[in-house]
From Swiss-Prot:
The keyword Zinc applies. The lineage of its organism: Bacteria, Pseudomonadati, Chlamydiota, Chlamydiia, Chlamydiales. It holds the Pfam family RecR_HhH. SUPFAM superfamilies: Recombination protein RecR. May play a role in DNA repair. It seems to be involved in an RecBC-independent recombinational process of DNA repair. It may act with RecF and RecO. It comes from Chlamydia caviae (strain ATCC VR-813 / DSM 19441 / 03DC25 / GPIC) (Chlamydophila caviae). A zinc finger (C4-type) spans 58-75. This is Recombination protein RecR. GO terms for biological process: DNA recombination; DNA repair. Residues 82-177 form the Toprim domain.
Amino acid sequence: MLKYPDYLSKLISLLRKLPGIGFKTAEKLAFELLDWDQDQLEAMGQAFSEVSAARSHCSTCFCLKNLPESNCEFCQNNRDTSTLCIVATPKDIFSLERSQIFKGHYYVLGTLLSPITGKHIDVERIGLLKQRIEFLKPQEIILALDATLEGDATALFLKQELAFSSASISRLALGLPIGLSFDYVDSGTLARAFSGRNPY
């Protein structure tokens, strides 16, 4: 029976926890890491340790930020207050920033609603979103969510929750195939989807 050394088995097992990484890919990556020299491995280990110690979220929009600042660079910069873009994860913000089409403010929900798994958005996070809207008083709220069942459910939920605001609500449309996550959309397609957003 095939049996790897314990350290290699543990590494493969940990790599498989990453989304989209199956056994074969994890095995390939693990063997690649075995060829790295000591300095490279130590640098990788240090990077993981720094992520664990320094991981922090903006107190305003919940994007990632550097310590010890309380706000991220997007909330510190002088951005357009007339638009607020709501996304599911911090990664979505960086995807949109690469498209260089949006100059307004962001807000991270933390997750999408899932009618299948029962996953829900934190009540406090929604309350803080409402406070953010009342403070900014944006003219438009953009729902930049995945074109999936979870994205649709979340958009419908937000439309109901944000009915108190006079801001128009729109959602990305053109260029985003049904069922596709932001993770697989290039910046050009995302830019077109942003430009072609529709009232929601």
